[in-house]
């Protein structure tokens, strides 16, 4: 695999070169400005191209080494793009309001995440919130929704991220300051009104246009996926050539799967699939419904079946990361 390709023409078509009005600028961005046209600063794309490449390389290297990338974009036009890109690349995101202390007070945030998971178990588990009055269930449901909106994108992060990718450092200034305080590198899109100081991987570009944001997120997601592939290679894992998992042979619909063979039930004691990143009790149940009960089955998935299972459980792009995890967890079980 390789880093995603892009051209200056793509950047132009997405409007990456358009900055803010010339009176709304940060003089520290002067080295990245090509000139002024119709009272609008024009960003020098000859600098954006290599800067973006460096940022993508940092993302890929971080993921290849087993690190976590946190996408941060809470402005309206970035929210959906950021969440989609993070999900597809098995990474994490904050696209609602950045809560002060999300990084610097991780212990408290972890407690809130634990509360979110507890509420989900209470409201969607076998008891379905029984034992509570209708009003109490409504209150708990509202609390769950509020926590999920704020923390849903980092609920499975398990610790501090190793790299932040930020859209608009002015709006996300608290996130940037927290990362800098903890020594976490930041890759960021910097418009002409931003401050590049302290940004490890600055990428001069339009941080307002929807098409530009979509392009950035797509490229960063693909860079993260490249890192996942490189990480597998470094571990000597060939996803399509894993040793066959120890599962019972059952007749399946011809052509339904590439090589995966579902089980009608666990062979002995089922493995705790919730140990895989992003697997909640609900996702584990969906995997069981598909005939997946053991880490060995996940470790043996080829790319086609991994993609299909991801689509079935509603986490496209996440299963590739599970394959490497399952390989290690399967060895521990043995």
From Swiss-Prot:
Pfam families: Ribosomal_S2. CDD domains: RPS2. InterPro entries: Ribosomal_uS2, Ribosomal_uS2_bac/mit/plastid, Ribosomal_uS2_CS, Ribosomal_uS2_flav_dom_sf. Keywords: Ribonucleoprotein, Ribosomal protein. GO terms for biological process: translation. The keyword Protein transport does not apply. GO terms for cellular component: cytosolic small ribosomal subunit. GO terms for molecular function: structural constituent of ribosome. It comes from the Bacteria. Belongs to the universal ribosomal protein uS2 family. This is Small ribosomal subunit protein uS2. It comes from Xanthobacter autotrophicus (strain ATCC BAA-1158 / Py2). The lineage of its organism: Bacteria, Pseudomonadati, Pseudomonadota, Alphaproteobacteria, Hyphomicrobiales. The gene is rpsB.
